[in-house]
Swiss-Prot record:
Transmembrane segments: none annotated. It comes from Legionella pneumophila subsp. pneumophila (strain Philadelphia 1 / ATCC 33152 / DSM 7513). Disulfide bonds: none annotated. Its EC number is 2.6.1.16. This is Glutamine--fructose-6-phosphate aminotransferase [isomerizing]. The lineage of its organism: Bacteria, Pseudomonadati, Pseudomonadota, Gammaproteobacteria, Legionellales.
Length: 604
């Protein structure tokens, strides 16, 4: 969500901060700002509503420069998107603060600070933090201690970066429930909400642990734990290769990432399967002891990852015979859960920092689960550190807010898990099909131009209906989510068998209905449902197996290359991604950074 960048250097850091923000744009934001302490120890700030480029233009007009500073991209939570609510926020013109997260007790703290004489100029919870730190600094004249004491009074999940004009040589950071990274350079050190922002600037990084605070100077970074005790944290080398964040020949990151799926699935499978078995060590050292005694499975995730879990339920129950329950993390964490004996708890997240998913994992660790397994794309994430077992997908950095390659690698991971838990020879057929999956994806990507030709038929639509049966129902859900995320068309998905129970009332000559129709045991049932749509004049678009002889009957048939039955949910996802992409491009929306959305949802 919000992006934080900060630096203390022997050189001017304004351009470094700006470049860091550019690398964080993918997280989603509505405003941006920067604050630096200049050579005369004056605190200078520039804020704008809109894009980072607008901030760059404004910075040129003010000639802002300095050796210590912080910068921020804001995704609105408290207070509307505006320059007034943009970060950094100031207190008494001395303290500047950037913030990612939510301070839940901000109203109580605001009233308390008003009684102390503080005045507020914004609608944000962030300004509360700035004034509270100023209050404690007045008592102690120690910026690190002031930040630590203020954070102890604040409830919620947040990360802060703070500078003080009277302390131009230092930058203070603290993390409570929201990720923050410390970066080591030469004659300069950094903070950021994502290591991606530090590539080519920092040589190595520390991933702050829960409750950590840090004092950053040009010469050193000192880290303190939640008890304010000086500690040593692991230092990790940082890959400075920036090519991975370039679009290359593609117009958008999303299209690039769609076309990377064959490669990243190959990478995810590599050295983890052969023709007869799944290497259980791929799921962590404990997996070989845990898997044989699993009797039930609970999967908890959000958004696209939740859809991956829904598909996995079909595979795990069919192949492994294990009762599987799938829940949305924000619902799971607030209800009483009955945990059967020997239940494996699985969390799924691209970033490994999704707030509700992490909270669900922490809740599960206090419950009677056999063990926890995290399926995640980021090796250094909190989710990975906290789980008993881990499967790392190898999707690489995903910039587009609408997830594509992260989703299909999650599905590949789940299909491997189902094969690993399967107790009969069907596992070998699954493994054979998995080895064919990258080639199947390549063939499907050749449909790009055909799918693009459909886009004009959707440009003026307001609604769309997606249908699937069985394991293809979650695929339809994912297709609908992609279309609504980036084209802003209201799209819903239903099991095709539910048409007569309500959704059929929506079907008319203006309603596009998209169906996912692989050659499986439910195909004839699906055809009957689609006849109901045709009979009512619905605009029917059917993604069909190219080996099938369909009678169009007024429907637009889009033929998908044949694939193994176990692979169909993965393969049929790709043309739906392409459809959403091309419709969004035709409508002129911001494909990589759709309105109101964030890449990594790090607040509740």
């Amino acid at each position: 969500m919000c992006g934080i960048m900060g630096a203390v250097s022997e050189r001017d850091i304004s351009k470094i901060l700006l470049e860091g923000l550019r690398r964080l744009e993918y997280r989603g934001y509505d405003s941006a700002g920067i604050a630096v302490i200049d050579s005369q120890d004056r605190l200078k700030r520039v804020r704008i509503q809109g894009k980072v480029q607008n901030l760059a233009d404004a910075m040129q007009e003010t000639a802002i420069a300095g050796n210590t500073g912080i910068a921020h991209t804001r995704w609105a939570t408290h207070g509307k998107p505006s320059e007034q609510n943009a970060h950094p926020h100031l207190s008494h013109g001395e303290i500047a603060l950037v913030h990612n997260g939510i301070i839940e007790n901000h109203e109580h703290l605001r009233q308390q600070l008003i009684t102390y004489g503080y005045q507020f100029t914004s609608e944000t919870d962030t300004e509360v933090a700035a004034h509270l730190i100023h209050y404690h600094y007045q008592q102690h004249e120690n910026l690190l201690l002031a930040v630590q004491k203020a954070a102890a009074e604040m409830q919620g999940a947040f990360a802060l970066g703070v500078i003080h004009q009277k302390r131009p040589e230092e930058l203070v950071a603290i993390r409570k429930g929201s990720p923050l990274v410390l970066g080591f350079g030469i004659g300069e050190n950094f903070i950021a909400s994502d290591a991606l922002a530090l590539r080519s600037f920092a040589q190595s990084v520390i991933y702050m642990e829960e409750g950590d605070s840090a004092c950053v100077t040009t010469q050193d970074i000192k880290v303190y734990d939640s008890n304010r005790i000086l500690v040593q944290r692991a230092v990790h080398p940082l890959n400075s290769d920036s090519e991975i964040v370039n679009k290359g020949p593609y117009r958008h990151f999303m299209l690039k990432e769609i076309f990377e799926q064959s490669k990243v699935i190959t990478d995810t499978l590599e050295s983890r399967i052969n023709s007869i078995d799944v290497l259980r060590a791929s799921f962590g050292e404990k997996a070989s002891h845990i898997f044989p005694v699993v009797k039930n499975i609970h999967i908890v995730a959000c958004g696209t990852s939740y859809h991956a879990g829904m598909i996995a339920k079909y595979w795990l129950e069919s192949l492994a015979g294990l009762p599987t329950q799938v829940e949305i993390a924000s619902e799971y964490r607030y209800r009483d859960v009955v945990v059967p004996d020997n239940t494996l708890f699985i969390t799924v997240s691209q970033s490994g920092e999704t707030a509700d998913t992490l909270a669900a994992l922490f809740k599960a660790k206090q419950s009677n689960y056999l063990a926890s397994l995290a399926i995640c794309n980021v090796a250094t994430s909190t989710l990975v550190r906290e789980a008993d077992c881990v499967f790392l997908t190898r999707a690489g950095i995903e910039i587009g807010v609408a997830s594509t390659k992260a989703f299909t690698t999650q599905l590949a991971a789940f299909l491997m898990l189902a094969a690993a838990l399967c107790k009969d020879n069907r596992a070998q057929e699954v493994l054979r099909q998995l080895q064919e999956l990258p080639a199947c994806c390549e063939r499907v990507l050749q449909m790009n131009e055909e799918v693009e030709s459909l886009a004009s038929l959707f440009v003026n639509k307001v609604h769309a209906l997606f249908l699937g049966r069985g394991v293809q129902y979650p695929v339809a859900l994912e297709g609908a989510l992609k279309l609504k995320e980036i084209s802003y068309i209201h799209a819903e998905a239903y099991p095709a068998g539910e048409l007569k129970h309500g959704p059929l009332a929506l079907v008319d000559k203006d309603m596009p209905v998209i169906a996912v129709a692989p050659n499986d045991e439910l195909l004839d049932k699906l055809k009957s449902n689609l006849h109901e749509v045709s009979a009512r004049g619905g605009q029917l678009f059917v993604f069909v197996d190219d080996s099938q002889n369909w009678k169009a009957n007024g429907a637009r048939l889009i033929k998908v290359p044949s694939c193994g039955a176990w692979l169909a949910p993965i393969v049929y996802t790709i043309p739906l991604q392409l459809l959403a992409y091309h419709v969004a491009v035709a409508k002129g929306t911001d494909v990589d950074q759709p309105r109101n959305l964030a890449k990594s949802v790090t607040v509740e």
